[in-house]
Curated annotation (Swiss-Prot):
Family to which the UniProt record says this protein belongs: Belongs to the CoaE family.
Functional note: Catalyzes the phosphorylation of the 3'-hydroxyl group of dephosphocoenzyme A to form coenzyme A.
Organism of origin: Anaplasma marginale (strain St. Maries)
HAMAP family: Dephospho_CoA_kinase
Protein name: Dephospho-CoA kinase
InterPro entries documented for this protein: Depp_CoAkinase (IPR001977), P-loop_NTPase (IPR027417)
Primary site of residence: cytoplasm
Domain DPCK, first and last residues per copy: 3-204
Amino acid sequence: MIVFGLSGGAGSGKSTVAAMFAQSCNAAVFDADKIVHSMYSGDAIITGLVAKYFPDCICNGVVSRERLSKHFFSYGPLWLEFQSILHSIVLRQQRKFILEQGKIGRDYAVLDVPLLLEAGFWRCCDFVINVDVHKSLQWHRLRQRGLSEREIEFLLSLQMPRGSRRNFADFYVNCGGRKGEVLKSVLQIVGSLNAGRHRFRVARKKLAMRSALDRRASTMASA
């Protein structure tokens, strides 16, 4: 099974690309946001974790994502500690997902994970796909989610610069056009792998950037 990881800034279109892989190649998609949101709704371990760090975010036994988001944007020491634990839980879920999909004979799996590179989730991938759009479209999409200018700037500041993400990736998809164009890019990626190209590009590139990413992750955890 080939495992693709999607890197890209918030609002770049990673979920769209993941859906294209699922529709065109029957790829299994690991959607970290959906998994975390589901755990917020009823997972006892996650609810207990939130209650420990942010008791004001528990309403009738359920995590209030709206209240929790305020702690995220404050990005204090408590949030960083909480986030580190949450990432470790999601990483275990991701590894379990990959093993399960491999056992049933799936050909492709796609990891749609925020901070794929920054938090180290890319290590489970065979190939990284950089998904991007023009900055103006990205900001438009984020505004439509109800984020303020300040919140958008903060959110994007946590992510690697565009150039670094693209340099690290094995493939690139522009998600600013029509869906047909995005689908074409997805099929080209799969076709190039089936033709035997790109198979030996990933190791050298990942090794070259591993130390830089580890330093960034360490800085985020200790800030």
